């Protein structure tokens, strides 16, 4: 059975880098006038040459976003269930080598978090854990997902890569979507940053979206950790290749792309390639032109000013008031966090800022009486 690994083996990192850097102003203009972007068009929009065309790129991205999603922007919040991790990764605050306090939420803790989150108004929840199969694996999910699911309209997960059979079971437990980020698509650089644990297996992670697609998960999230490799443009292009593969082979699923830039954390590394804010806007808008129908998400890793200015252009899914540590909504203990969020504003403040720009914050776009995609497909 073919997976994205087959396509990945056809892609040469240095060749893609040279092709992107070789794009000209004429290539960018051609891409801007294309009804549907080709791979070459995307390379042009990710290239240094596109920097001078940021305004027309953003204008077209905004038009496409409004045509597809109207003025709506969906809100979600992450719920961190555990910071236990069996991996040693250079860039993550949860890494097993970091001497931080560890915590896994029990039934009482989870209910306190759910109560606190519901008071904030959120209905869409992203469940996050460190990667620890023994203590925060399927047994843990079987025990606690039913309780959480009853209280929220939509549940998504960002946990360790699992088997196709596990994902099929999670679907029956009420999971609507799974986010899995490759971190970097450069195999050698990936190995430099993943020193111990199951996460060292580059291809197990690379093929996770294929397993999600075969399991029939409704929404699949893709992305790279921008700045981990020495060329963010190539990594972002590889995310696009992964997206195109998934859309072709698992067309029944919906897709989401996120753009996390490397943020400070305990024991963390400095970015190997720096993407500035204009380049992040360029990349987000390029993805909107490539795939007008997908969800583009922007988290609290970015500053309030940046989010307020970029969300109206091409973003249709945002987090707010995120706590990146287990138990953070009921009891805020920053020493447990995975990374330090940049936008710490309360959700109503973020919503007001977007409403002032003519956007409509959406806290809930599904109800249990309608049935769930995870149950009816």
UniProtKB/Swiss-Prot annotation:
PROSITE patterns: RADICAL_SAM. SUPFAM superfamilies: Radical SAM enzymes. Pathway: Cofactor biosynthesis; thiamine diphosphate biosynthesis. CDD domains: Radical_SAM. Coiled coil: none annotated. Keywords: 4Fe-4S, Iron, Iron-sulfur, Lyase, Metal-binding, NADP, S-adenosyl-L-methionine, Thiamine biosynthesis. It is an enzyme of class 4 (lyase). It comes from the Bacteria. This is 2-iminoacetate synthase. The lineage of its organism: Bacteria, Pseudomonadati, Pseudomonadota, Gammaproteobacteria, Enterobacterales.
């Amino acid at each position: 059975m073919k997976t994205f690994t087959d396509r990945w083996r056809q892609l040469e990192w240095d060749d893609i880098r040279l092709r992107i850097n070789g794009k000209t102003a004429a290539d960018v203009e051609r891409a801007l006038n294309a009804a549907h972007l080709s791979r070459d068009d995307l390379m042009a929009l990710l290239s240094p040459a596109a920097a001078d065309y940021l305004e027309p790129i953003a204008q077209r991205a905004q038009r496409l976003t409004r045509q597809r999603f109207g003025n709506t922007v969906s809100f979600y919040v992450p719920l961190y269930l555990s910071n236990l991790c069996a991996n040693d990764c250079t860039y993550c605050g949860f890494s097993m080598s970091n001497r931080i306090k560890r915590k896994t939420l029990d039934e009482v803790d989870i209910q306190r978090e759910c109560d606190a989150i519901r008071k904030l108004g959120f209905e869409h929840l992203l469940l996050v854990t460190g990667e620890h199969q023994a203590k925060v694996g399927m047994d843990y999910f079987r025990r606690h997902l039913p309780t959480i699911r009853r209280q929220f309209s939509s549940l998504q997960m960002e946990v360790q890569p699992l088997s196709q059979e596990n994902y099929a079971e999670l679907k029956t437990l009420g999971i609507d979507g799974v986010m899995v980020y490759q971190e970097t698509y450069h195999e050698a650089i990936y190995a430099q940053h993943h020193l111990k644990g199951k996460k060292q297996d580059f291809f197990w992670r690379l093929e996770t979206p294929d397993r999600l697609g075969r399991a029939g998960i409704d929404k699949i999230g893709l992305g790279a950790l921008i700045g981990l490799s020495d060329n963010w443009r190539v990594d972002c292009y590889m995310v696009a290749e992964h997206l195109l593969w998934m859309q072709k082979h698992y067309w029944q699923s919906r897709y989401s792309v996120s753009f996390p830039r490397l943020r400070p954390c305990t024991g963390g590394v400095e970015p190997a390639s720096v993407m500035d804010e204009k380049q992040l806007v360029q990349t987000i808008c390029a993805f909107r032109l490539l795939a007008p129908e997908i969800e583009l998400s922007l988290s609290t890793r970015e500053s309030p000013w940046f989010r307020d200015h970029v969300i109206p252009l091409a973003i249709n899914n945002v987090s707010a008031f995120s706590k990146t540590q287990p138990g953070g909504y009921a009891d805020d203990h920053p020493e447990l966090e995975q990374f330090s969020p940049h936008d710490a504003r309360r959700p109503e403040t973020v919503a007001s800022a977007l409403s002032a720009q003519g956007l409509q914050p959406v806290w809930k776009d599904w109800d249990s009486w309608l049935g769930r995609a995870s149950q009816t497909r």
